[in-house]
Design a protein with these regions (language model features):
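P-loop NTPase catalytic core of nucleic-acid-dependent motor ATPases
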Residues: 52-78, 121, 134-254
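Substrate-gripping "pore-loop 1 plus following alpha2 helix"
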Residues: 234-244, 271-292
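Catalytic nucleotidyl-transfer cores of nucleotide-processing enzymes
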Residues: 124-132, 297-310
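A short, contiguous, amphipathic alpha-helix enriched in charged residues
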Residues: 33-41, 223-226, 267-283
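AAA+/SF3 P-loop NTPase mechanochemical coupling elements
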Residues: 247-253, 285-304
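Intein modules and their embedded homing endonuclease domains
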Residues: 1-153
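Phosphate-sensing "switch" segment of ASCE/P-loop ATPases
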Residues: 295-298, 314-321
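Conserved AAA+/SF3 P-loop NTPase catalytic/coupling segment centered on the Walker-B
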Residues: 255-279, 311-318
Length: 321
């Protein structure tokens, strides 16, 4: 089972206090039900100072995350319900509680997770999770997987310190012949992994050239390597000029790069553009949500274009970016 380690964790921790609870009951006893709620909450929500019980978190949007042994991943609330039922079954909890109380237990735990600041999932992008460990950008070392490394940058390949790619060097050299420009491209892509709360990065990168010159190939190679969880693909017009821009801004929040494969020949300059490139906050909105959401985790912009788009903004601030 995918979450067997979570089931094992709950059996080892909450298990002893719920074993055989209400085994012979023919109807739900509220006192027994309350005891189940308390036992599960202790180890799903944890307590102050007990870092070993930090398996479950909730983000600012109320989405549930669970530590899967390597990193924190999204979990459906229905999946948590299934895990609680399975733990109850394995610990011989009465059947009336498995069918009648498991959802109450689940909701009791979720309410605490969502209401307790200690349970908030706050990713630290000093850490990057690879398949073979967690890389610390502060120490530049690879560490073993651990609950303490809370990150949302998950890369589906191994970290190899001295890895080289002759094919990448060849294609990049053909596409960007100038060595200084290649170094600039490398540096900008490296900035995707930098925390914008620690470093002030106020640039957009245009890879400019005629069609079929390889610019999309090198950009897509980088973006596809990072994966859709941290990379979005909206055009500047969709982000700064569209009537749907609030939805698009909400969607890019938390990404590390927004890539546009083909920038149109339209002017998208202005205050919103400069604010975005500087990492300034916006107000966005998720589809079907009645409440606006703060957009303050702004990605860097990487764009391909046949030529630099026109602008009506002749300020120093625009050209500096």
């Amino acid at each position: 089972m995918k979450y067997q380690h979570i089931i094992d964790y709950l059996i080892q921790t909450a298990g002893p206090s719920i074993e055989d609870a209400g085994l012979s009951d023919e109807r739900v006893n509220k006192r027994t039900e309350a005891g189940l709620c308390k036992s599960f909450r202790r180890y799903i929500c944890g307590v102050e100072g007990d870092e070993d019980c930090d398996y479950f978190k909730v983000d600012e949007e109320g989405m549930l995350y669970v530590f899967n042994g390597q990193y924190y991943e999204l979990m459906l609330e229905e999946t948590l319900l299934e895990l609680i039922i399975e733990v109850m079954e394995k610990k011989n909890v009465g059947i009336v509680y498995q069918t009648g109380s498991a959802k109450i237990v689940r909701d009791y735990c979720l309410n605490r997770l969502k209401g307790d600041e200690r349970c908030k999932f706050v990713p630290n992008r000093q850490y990057i999770c690879f398949k073979n460990g967690v890389f610390d950008l502060g120490t530049m070392k690879l560490n073993q997987f651990d609950l303490k490394y809370k990150t949302d940058i998950i890369l589906d390949f191994d970290y190899v310190a001295d890895a080289k790619s002759a094919l990448w060097d060849k294609v990049l050299g053909m596409t960007v012949p100038d060595e200084n420009m290649r170094e600039t491209f490398h540096q900008y892509c490296g900035c995707f992994l930098a925390s914008r709360t620690e470093y002030k990065i106020e640039y957009i990168l245009f890879v400019v050239g005629e069609g079929q010159n390889g610019k999309s190939i090198i950009c897509k190679a980088v973006v596809n390597m990072l994966g859709p969880n941290v990379a979005s693909s909206y055009s500047p017009e969709q982000l700064f000029k569209s009537s749907q821009m609030e939805y698009h801004l909400a969607d890019v929040n938390g990404k590390i790069v927004n890539y546009c494969d083909e920038v149109s020949n339209k002017d998208f300059s202005g205050g919103d553009f400069k604010q975005f490139v500087s990492g300034g906050a916006f107000t966005g909105r998720h589809p079907y949500s009645k409440r606006p959401t703060k957009v303050d985790k702004i990605p860097l912009m990487l764009c391909c274009a046949n030529k630099i788009p026109p602008t009506t903004d002749d300020t120093e601030g625009y050209f500096r970016r």
